[in-house]
């Protein structure tokens, strides 16, 4: 378990220097700036991915994950519309190219209408600027697409996609990490939002148990779901199965019908207890900050806000490491599956439905954990 840096769409010299100054080794990119030709092809290209990975490595960093592609790359897949086969072929080739380039994780979502907020300049502590959401202001929004969609057809579309993309992901050693819907409400813009609660994530993992299928555990979204309740239970359930591939660590005040993103140390959850729980269940992936408040004189990327969040997470990590040392510290990066050999087509392997299993901590280590972790706040299950 380690802290990384991410939510960046370009590996500028300034960003790479910032990462090293924070003492981090791993980089995640989110919806990176696409070359003009890639915008037309609708897929991630091998040479572009290789250039990104090489640029990070030249500065002593690892490009560990690419998260998200433009919604237009797979909107027909999500909605079950004509043309989805063409988009599927492009997404399959994108996965192959990630594997060929040695980038082991692809973070994805199934949110055809995107992230919604009803307030983008919400003042929080000390006048910092954040964002917020109120269901009351969004529930009457018009259809985002051509009609109103129902939940079961969205599940059918999701199953169709996963059945066809996961065998490619397994062949090329690329793990697919599912992000929750944000906000996690039943429907917005006429389209159901499937990944809004524990039961639906459980359904997705059970229906597609391939070892390459897991979670981008966005703590902020899980905190939104029930006002902070249930976060530890979800981390324990999916973490013990080895289904949490990496973590977005942010927090909110409130629940899914009315919440405000806040500083990481003042939200619904006790972040220390969350990270301790992740260590307890054997999580060995990386944790990054996520959305951060915009501080005075901050940059567009939010360097000040991110330095605050990353420093906070690093300090907690240090304490967690002291209270429960990793019994196999050399394996901290071994959790990232070995990438396919560069530019060489790997052998086809029979798909496996067995998730990776992590050895639980010893009884002595468990006894050292805090009892009855406290979660602040509350909310109704949606």
Q: Model-found features: residue ranges?
A:
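Active-site-proximal beta-alpha loop/turn segments in soluble metabolic enzymes
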Residues: 138-154, 180-190, 295-297
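Non-cysteine beta-strand/loop elements that form the S-adenosyl-L-methionine
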Residues: 24-32, 66, 108, 134-135, ...
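Structural motif corresponding to the early beta-alpha repeats
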Residues: 30-159, 170-171, 221
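N-terminal basic, low-complexity leaders that serve as flexible interaction/assembly modules and, when applicable
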Residues: 1-46, 53-54
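Histidine-acidic metal/acid-base catalytic patches
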Residues: 2-4, 9-11, 16-20, 57, ...
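Short secondary-structure capping/turn micro-motifs that flank functional sites
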Residues: 27, 35-36, 72-73, 114-115, ...
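Generic detector of short, locally flexible boundary/turn motifs and exposed helical patches
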Residues: 29-30, 70-73, 140-144, 179-183, ...
């Amino acid at each position: 378990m380690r802290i990384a840096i991410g939510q960046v769409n370009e590996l500028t010299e300034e960003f790479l220097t910032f990462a090293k100054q924070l003492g981090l080794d791993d980089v995640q990119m989110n919806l990176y700036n696409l070359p003009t030709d890639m915008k037309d092809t609708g897929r991630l290209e091998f040479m572009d991915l290789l250039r990104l990975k090489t640029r990070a490595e030249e500065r002593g960093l690892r490009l560990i994950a690419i998260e998200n592609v433009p919604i237009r790359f797979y909107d027909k897949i999500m909605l079950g519309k004509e043309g989805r086969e063409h988009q599927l072929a492009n997404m399959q080739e994108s996965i192959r190219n990630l594997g060929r380039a040695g980038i082991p994780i692809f973070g994805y979502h199934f949110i055809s209408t995107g992230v919604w907020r009803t307030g983008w300049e919400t003042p929080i502590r000390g006048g910092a600027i954040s964002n917020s959401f109120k269901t009351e202001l969004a529930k009457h929004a018009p259809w985002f697409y051509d009609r109103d969609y129902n939940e079961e057809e969205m599940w059918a579309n999701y199953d169709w996609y996963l059945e066809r993309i996961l065998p490619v992901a397994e062949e090329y050693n690329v793990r697919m990490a599912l992000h929750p819907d944000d906000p996690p409400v039943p429907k917005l813009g006429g389209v159901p939002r499937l990944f809004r609660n524990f039961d639906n994530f459980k359904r997705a993992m059970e229906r597609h148990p391939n070892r390459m299928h897991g979670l981008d555990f966005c703590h902020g979204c899980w905190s939104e779901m029930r006002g902070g309740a249930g976060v530890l239970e979800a981390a324990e359930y999916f973490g013990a199965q080895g289904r949490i591939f990496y973590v977005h660590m942010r927090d909110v005040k409130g629940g899914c019908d009315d919440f405000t993103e806040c500083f990481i140390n003042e939200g619904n959850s006790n972040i220390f207890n969350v990270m301790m729980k992740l260590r307890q269940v054997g999580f060995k992936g990386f944790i990054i900050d996520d959305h951060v408040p915009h501080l005075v004189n901050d940059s567009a990327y939010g360097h000040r806000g991110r330095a605050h969040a990353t420093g906070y997470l690093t300090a907690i990590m240090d304490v967690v490491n002291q209270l429960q040392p990793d019994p196999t510290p050399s394996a901290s990066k071994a959790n990232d599956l070995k990438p396919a050999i560069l530019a060489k087509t790997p052998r086809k392997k029979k798909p496996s439905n067995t998730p990776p299993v992590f050895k639980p901590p010893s009884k002595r280590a468990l006894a050292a954990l805090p009892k009855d972790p406290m979660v602040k706040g509350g909310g109704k299950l949606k």
